[in-house]
A protein has these predicted regions:
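Hydrophobic faces of well-ordered beta-strands that scaffold small-molecule active sites
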Residues: 22-24, 50-54, 77, 119-123, ...
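Alpha/beta catalytic cores of nucleotide-metabolism and tRNA/nucleoside-modifying enzymes
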Residues: 2-3, 8, 106-109, 114-116, ...
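Short glycine-/acidic-enriched loop or helix-start segments at secondary-structure transitions
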Residues: 7-8, 33, 64, 88, ...
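Short, hinge-like loop/turn segments at secondary-structure boundaries
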Residues: 38-43, 95-97, 137-139, 168-170, ...
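Active-site beta-loop-alpha junctions enriched in small/polar residues
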Residues: 1-3, 27-29, 55-57, 82-84, ...
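Alpha/beta enzyme core
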Residues: 15, 63-77, 81-93, 102-189, ...
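Short, basic/glycine-rich phosphate-binding loops at helix/coil junctions
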Residues: 44-46, 87-88, 159, 281
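Glycine-rich, positively charged N-terminal anion/phosphate-binding segment
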Residues: 1-75
């Protein structure tokens, strides 16, 4: 998610789950090739398993980024074909590319030929007024011809002409049955459900016929949802850290960062950690004032120490 799943958020996520596969923000190839490559690509080994998610429509540019990423420890590279924002549409990448399967094939072929990583795609059920019963199978079949076999499927259409990104996450109806049918039709592909998923345990049972689940906004707005991922989905021990311990770890992590902008982003990412708690608003206010933050750290820890010793 753009402006959400940066390195600071991923550090927070790793306080809650050691097993969940994390994604970078969607990063446009031009930002990497013409910007600060270290800023966009470097990460700590603790963030793995980690997927680099790219946006773009130029096979040559995508291949160059793949070559760069060969030197960096990513587990997978994902081409985003599902983002519906106006900026993405005007730049002809994201969900807009679902209308151009031949170009997508060229992009993916270039990525596969120049990468030593697994290549995957993130898609929607379709765009605008497409008939998802016909167009989706055709699109997936064409993409699979490149050798890509991992599809993260947001179980909604993307309406590119009329709806905002927020509305595109809410107004087009969820159609999980279409995702299930996709798996039945393409048994050899890995089909991972995305969209509207808010409960790990329920989702494990509801999507047992698929190859996995992908959680986006809910994992950002309520990071504590990740606290039981390891035991429920990976049959491993949960990290079982208290909110106090997680908060202290984040504060110690911020002390290692050199740029104020990184710390500010990290503080914002922490807001959802306290959702539903009695003192959530007070804690968010304390986190929001960067100039006061260092003085407020002990007050925040005290609030958590006194009232919230339960496991996250």
């Amino acid at each position: 998610m753009m402006a959400k799943t940066d390195s600071q958020y991923r550090y927070l996520a790793r306080q809650l789950s050691s097993k969940a596969v994390l994604f970078t923000e969607m990063i446009h190839t031009n930002a990497i090739l013409h910007g600060n490559q270290s800023k966009f690509l470097d990460h700590t080994k603790e963030q793995n398993p980690l997927v680099l998610q790219l946006g773009g429509n130029n096979p040559e540019a995508l291949s160059k980024v793949c070559v760069l990423s060969n030197e960096i420890d990513y587990d997978e590279i994902n081409l985003n074909l599902g983002c519906p924002s106006p900026k993405v549409k005007s730049g002809n990448f994201g969900a807009a590319l679902m209308a151009q399967p031949e170009l997508v094939k060229d992009c993916l072929t270039a990525m596969i030929e120049n990468s030593d990583k697994t290549i995957s795609v993130k898609i929607r059920l379709g765009i605008n007024d497409e008939d998802i019963n016909e167009s989706l199978d055709k699109f997936v079949s064409m993409i699979a011809e490149t050798g890509v076999n991992i599809f993260y499927v947001h179980a909604r259409k993307a309406i590119l002409e009329k709806l905002s990104p927020k509305d595109n996450r809410e107004i087009p109806p969820l159609n999980y049955e279409r995702v299930r049918q996709l798996k039945k039709d393409f048994k050899t592909l890995e089909i991972i459900a995305n969209g509207g998923i808010k409960d790990i345990n329920e989702s494990k049972n509801a999507f047992s016929d698929l190859d996995g689940i992908m959680i986006g906004r809910e994992a950002y707005s309520n990071p504590r949802i990740l606290g039981n991922v390891d035991s429920i989905l990976y049959q491993s021990n949960d990290m079982n850290k208290s909110l106090k311990e997680i908060t202290e770890n984040m504060f110690n992590y911020f002390d290692t960062l050199n740029r104020k902008s990184e710390i500010k982003r990290g503080l914002i990412h922490m807001h959802g950690l306290y959702s539903g708690l009695k003192d959530a608003r007070k804690i968010r206010v304390l986190l929001s004032n960067f100039n006061y933050f260092k003085k407020a750290k002990n007050e925040i820890i005290s609030l958590l120490d006194n009232q919230y010793s339960e496991v996250a």
